[in-house]
Amino acid sequence: MENEVNAGTASSSRWNPTKDQITLLENLYKEGIRTPSADQIQQITGRLRAYGHIEGKNVFYWFQNHKARQRQKQKQERMAYFNRLLHKTSRFFYPPPCSNVGCVSPYYLQQASDHHMNQHGSVYTNDLLHRNNVMIPSGGYEKRTVTQHQKQLSDIRTTAATRMPISPSSLRFDRFALRDNCYAGEDINVNSSGRKTLPLFPLQPLNASNADGMGSSSFALGSDSPVDCSSDGAGREQPFIDFFSGGSTSTRFDSNGNGL
């Protein structure tokens, strides 16, 4: 019997709001009441009892639950708004047009594989700076082919080869080409590197012919012009010093090149 009484009391204490009660509570919420005080709860409860059964705690919990539901609803509406905005923007979004500065492809360095050898070792051509793509006046792109790169490499190698310094070992001289104190220019020799040196002593014999009948050459060391060997002492006897045999023997010749 007691259990039935408790069940009836519990069922009777459960609040089932009527439509008029909900309408009145929502109007109060819209007026700005969010957390009513104890006096406000008693006043609201007295007004709502005219429309049905209600207690003070029912009024308190209704405002708490309604406030939480409104916050959740506003959060969902904001999320839905941002999702629609993002979807709409992504559909009609286009990247900005490329300018002549921002859309140029990056540079890369390419080292020439060809090399030239001289007395100091290998001499490589300078590194080349290429672009994979270049802008043309119409605003489009022009692709550089491998053939164009190879042609440019070939042109630069040719230019580098023409500017290579001549090795001193490549200059050939006649042992019997120069006469004593008879040099091109003002007794100054210019080597292949462009540096001027003074002749300290004669390096070659003077106006002499070898046993095979080879004549004297008119080419001087480091000079592009012929050597004028018409000196005053053409008729006198000239000594011949052999610097290449390693000996110290000095042989004298007459004006015709015959040994004395």
Curated annotation (Swiss-Prot):
InterPro entries: HD (IPR001356), Homeodomain-like_sf (IPR009057), WUSCHEL-like (IPR044555). Residues 10-74 bind DNA. It comes from Arabidopsis thaliana (Mouse-ear cress). CDD domains: homeodomain. GO terms for cellular component: nucleus. Keywords: Developmental protein, DNA-binding, Homeobox, Nucleus, Transcription, Transcription regulation. PROSITE patterns: HOMEOBOX_2. Belongs to the WUS homeobox family. GO terms for molecular function: DNA binding; DNA-binding transcription factor activity. Coiled coil: none annotated. GO terms for biological process: apical cell fate commitment; cotyledon boundary formation; cotyledon development; embryonic pattern specification; longitudinal axis specification; positive regulation of cell population proliferation. The gene is WOX2. It is found in: Nucleus. It comes from the Eukaryota. Probable transcription factor involved in embryonic patterning. Required for apical embryo development after fertilization. Its specific localization to the apical daughter cell of the zygote, while WOX8 is confined to the basal cell, suggests that the asymmetric division of the plant zygote separates determinants of apical and basal cell fates. This is WUSCHEL-related homeobox 2.
